């Protein structure tokens, strides 16, 4: 299972939100390029970027930082937040990003996402952010009546690379991921799932590893890395070693 460090950009700085609340911001760095290089040096195989300004307004606001990061790194970079048109996605993919993540537009214009994925196979990711099982959009500000698993099923036969499944209630809390929601998401679609939200310790990563056979292939980690609760290098090593062993029985109780 791949661990993907996250950098959330707000006003050009690296921040984390608590449960997606723009009024609950923790600022970690004013130098996103240096932060990105740090994750790469610690062994990250991919970087996850979020333009929080873009997610809230629909207008790109951190392009200079995004370009600087992609130019500085040698690992693939994926970006979400405010990517709501085919033109914007095409431009980003042509400027060095490996993948673009579409959330709001995936709910509002799913066919556009399918067509974009056909043009860029393996480079389009659908971000499904859920609150109490229902899809939330526009930077998690607006709630819909669409079930997250139902939206995932719409893209099962498409050329998208993956689905990022975020449980908003756990995001930024460090209280553990919503394993049941991730299990349901993985079972609802044949597309690989990337877990996001709630990871706070090594035990959470080991718990997620039990979902890998279902198609949960990676996990995005933010605050736990910044707070030092998880060391990226040590976590990568521990996951690699755990894959060679049977998972602890107590981690499987929820799925018996």
From Swiss-Prot:
Its main location: cytoplasm. One of its GO terms (cellular component) is cytoplasm. CDD domains: HisA. GO terms for molecular function: 1-(5-phosphoribosyl)-5-[(5-phosphoribosylamino)methylideneamino]imidazole-4-carboxamide isomerase activity. Keywords: Amino-acid biosynthesis, Cytoplasm, Histidine biosynthesis, Isomerase. Its EC number is 5.3.1.16. It catalyses: 1-(5-phospho-beta-D-ribosyl)-5-[(5-phospho-beta-D-ribosylamino)methylideneamino]imidazole-4-carboxamide = 5-[(5-phospho-1-deoxy-D-ribulos-1-ylimino)methylamino]-1-(5-phospho-beta-D-ribosyl)imidazole-4-carboxamide. It is found in: Cytoplasm. InterPro entries: Aldolase_TIM (IPR013785), His_biosynth (IPR006062), HisA_bact_arch (IPR006063), Isoase_HisA-like (IPR044524), Isoase_HisA-like_bact (IPR023016), RibuloseP-bd_barrel (IPR011060). This is 1-(5-phosphoribosyl)-5-[(5-phosphoribosylamino)methylideneamino] imidazole-4-carboxamide isomerase. It comes from Synechococcus sp. (strain WH7803). The gene is hisA.
